A protein has these predicted regions:
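Short, well-structured alpha-helical segments in soluble
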Residues: 83-102, 113-116
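Periplasmic-binding protein-like
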Residues: 42-44, 95-108, 126, 170-173, ...
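Hydrophobic core
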Residues: 9, 13-18
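Flexible loop/hinge segments that line or gate small-molecule binding clefts
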Residues: 113, 117-153
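Bacterial lipoprotein signal-peptidase II cleavage site
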Residues: 18-31
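Short beta-strand elements in bilobed, periplasmic/extracellular small-molecule ligand-binding domains
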Residues: 60, 65-88, 143, 189-202
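An alpha-beta-alpha
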Residues: 41, 59, 149-195
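Extracytoplasmic "Venus flytrap"
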Residues: 35-61, 66, 77-86, 177-181
Length: 202
């Protein structure tokens, strides 16, 4: 089981790095394992979105490739939370009830919901596409780990100034309901303050 979980974590890391960035579901099973044991993995995507779709497809491809390489069987099932907390909570309850061996949530709301759903049973949660795991309170949890796709805010703003060095005011557009917005917005404000550039928040 430890080797399986290490493999799942590696798959999540690799898939996230390879990606460019209801509960409709499908199931796929890899080649049968020599031991006859089949591991069940739930892939929980927060919503339909091109970059998240890419990550999910990459995770599925890596699961199949690694399972074939290691000679184990993995049955994975896709769940879509439709960006709805109620739907995600229902998925979390179902995944726990169905006895999945691991959960791979994609994006912040999916990850925090799955972390909460597994508090009692400690099913491993390996998240992907989280910009700020600390701000999302996904760190320091024994059964939760994953990958971060944090922005390099200073680099982005440096490029902006190279393209337009005379810029006087910058608009900061973000969602206050999204935990991933907190750190990059704070970093952007600090950067702009240091350059004496005004900003507007929306």
């Amino acid at each position: 089981m430890k080797k399986f979980l290490s493999m799942i974590a590696a798959v999540s890391l690799l898939a996230a790095s390879l990606s460019a960035c209801g509960a409709s579901s499908t199931t796929s099973t890899t080649a049968a394992a020599e031991s006859g044991k089949e591991y069940k993995v739930a892939i929980v995507q927060q919503l339909d979105h091109a970059s998240l779709d890419e990550i999910r497809v990459a995770i599925e491809a890596e699961l199949e490739a690694k399972a074939a390489e290691k000679g184990i069987a993995i049955a994975y099932k896709d769940f879509n939370g439709q960006n709805d907390t109620t739907v995600l909570n229902q998925i979390g309850a179902q995944v726990v009830s169905d006895g999945y061996d691991a959960i791979i949530p994609i994006a912040t709301l999916a990850a925090t919901t799955m972390a909460t759903a597994t508090e009692d049973n400690q099913i491993p949660v390996i998240y992907a596409a989280i910009s700020d795991p600390g701000e999302a309170q996904l760190t320091g949890i024994a059964n939760v780990t994953g990958t971060s796709d944090a922005l390099n805010t200073a680099f982005i703003l440096d490029m902006m100034l190279k393209a337009n060095p005379d810029i006087e005011t910058v608009g900061l557009l973000y969602s206050n309901s999204e935990a991933n917005s907190v750190t990059p917005v704070r970093e952007a404000k600090e950067y702009l303050d240091s350059k004496g550039i005004a900003y507007l928040e929306k």
